[in-house]
């Protein structure tokens, strides 16, 4: 049996539970045709570079598959039929990667606070506390030092 990495994009308007159900459905197709599904990763809802079938975002999912080619072809056939799947890609690999994929490592990196490891910034502009403003010259605003204009009804 050959080894594959399979990624598919599901519509933005379905829930995460429905994405998990799609993964389980396609996992069942692979197992019914004599294959095995290893690692499954749900990368979550991400923005697309361009619109696909009027969607600006999509749920991404990755599956590591060890199955005969016929099983993968059947899964891809069912994905073509499904309205919930926007795109899919299957790649034959020599061996499956151990540990989390690059996308999951990136997500872990993005969860950390952003300070750049250098601590708070000194000088410059930005979020520094400038303290209270000094009082304005001449009271509140500019209008106190001007004489009032006469109104036509007051004359």
Curated annotation (Swiss-Prot):
CDD domains in the cross-refs: bS6 (cd00473)
InterPro entries: Ribosomal_bS6, Ribosomal_bS6_sf, Ribosomal_S6_plastid/chlpt, Transl_elong_EF1B/ribsomal_bS6
Single GO biological process annotation from the record: translation
Ranges in coiled-coil conformation: none
Keywords for this protein: Ribonucleoprotein, Ribosomal protein, RNA-binding, rRNA-binding
Region of interest: Disordered: 94-155
Superkingdom field: Bacteria
Ligase as UniProt keyword: no
Pfam families membership: Ribosomal_S6
GO CC terms: cytosolic small ribosomal subunit
GO molecular function terms listed in the Swiss-Prot or TrEMBL record: small ribosomal subunit rRNA binding; structural constituent of ribosome
NCBIfam families hit by this protein: S6
General function of this protein: Binds together with bS18 to 16S ribosomal RNA.
Sequence similarity: Belongs to the bacterial ribosomal protein bS6 family.
Protein name per Swiss-Prot or TrEMBL: Small ribosomal subunit protein bS6
Native source organism of the sequence: Rhizobium johnstonii (strain DSM 114642 / LMG 32736 / 3841)
Gene designation per UniProt: rpsF
